Amino acid sequence: MYAETLKLVARLPERRPAPVLPARLDQLFRHLALPACDAQDLEEEIWQVWMHHPHRRAAIALDRAADDIAAQRFDLAETRLERLVRACPDFPEAWNKRATLYYLLERDEESVRDIHRTLELEPRHFGALCGLAEICASRGERDDALFVFQAALRVNPHLDSARTSMEQLRSGTSH
C-alpha cells in the first residue's frame, strides 16, 4: 500500500475531490493558496468543513472519536471509527481520523491504508499528506518524506511545520 499511496500522491494535482465534499472548500483552498491570507483562519475553517457531515450522527461520532483519541481511549476511538467508515465510506475525515489513530498506535501500514483512502476522497487533505510524510520519515525514506511534504505545501503553502520538517530532513537533524 505504501508504494501505491506514493503513486497516488504523484497524481494528486490531476485529481478532483469527491462530489460529496462541499463546493465551498474550492474557494477556501483558492484563498489559502494566496501569499497574503489569514492562513490560520482558513485552515481552521477547512478543518471545520472536513469534520462536518450532512448526517448529524456521523459528525457526532467523529467528534466523539476525536475526543477519545485526545483522551487516549484508543480502543473506544477505534470502535467508533470502524463503525463510521463502514456507515459513511465517503467521509474523508473519518478515514483520516482513523489513520491518525493508527499512526499514534504505531500501526503504520494501517495508517497508510487509511491515508490512501482519505486522499482518494480529498486530494487536498494536507493533514493526511503531512501524516504520510511523517511515516515516510520514520521509515528512513527521506526522499519520499520530502516529496510528500512538498505535495502538502503545494496544497497549503503556509504549513510552517512541513517546511521545518523538510529542513530537518535535508540537514539530517530529524527522524
Predicted feature locations:
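TPR-adjacent "capping" and linker segments in tetratricopeptide-repeat scaffold/adaptor proteins
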Residues: 13-19, 47-60
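Alpha-solenoid helical repeat scaffolds
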Residues: 29, 44-47, 82, 116, ...
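TPR/TPR-like (Sel1-like) alpha-helical repeat modules
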Residues: 32-35, 142-171
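Helix-turn-helix repeat elements of alpha-solenoid scaffolds
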Residues: 34-41, 70-75
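Alpha-helical adaptor scaffolds
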Residues: 55-127
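Register position in tetratricopeptide repeats
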Residues: 70, 104, 138-139, 171-172
